[in-house]
From Swiss-Prot:
UniProt-recorded name of the protein: NADH-ubiquinone oxidoreductase chain 3
The organism of origin for this protein: Peromyscus slevini (Slevin's mouse)
Quaternary structure, from the entry: Core subunit of respiratory chain NADH dehydrogenase (Complex I) which is composed of 45 different subunits. Interacts with TMEM186. Interacts with TMEM242.
Function: Core subunit of the mitochondrial membrane respiratory chain NADH dehydrogenase (Complex I) which catalyzes electron transfer from NADH through the respiratory chain, using ubiquinone as an electron acceptor. Essential for the catalytic activity of complex I.
The family this protein is said to belong to: Belongs to the complex I subunit 3 family.
Record's bilayer topology term: Multi-pass membrane protein
InterPro entries (alphabetical): NADH_UbQ/plastoQ_OxRdtase_su3, NDAH_ubi_oxred_su3_sf
Amino acid sequence: MNMLTVLSVNIALSTCLITIAFWLPQLNLYTEKANPYECGFDPMSSARLPFSMKFFLVAITFLLFDLEIALLLPLPWAIQMNNINTMMLTAFILVSVLALGLAYEWMQKGLEWTE
């Protein structure tokens, strides 16, 4: 009962904050808000430079494997647990999912830098 109350309050508060976050910026629409600020001067060139999608994919892949390392670091301490099979199965599933994702990205040529 107590957990249900906390969960419902959190969901209601989150919904309220998300609604306010989407509603509030639409009150004052000025063209100056969309322009970049360059120390009071008019912008010399476009501040909205095109972003390389290949770089984005490589960066996201790096972050995923960095997160994998962070998740696998506690394994030496987890070996001391009584149920080592569960720990090894969890680690195997984590590495397998990441390897499948890497293979899929490689097959889609997401890691080739040809631009």
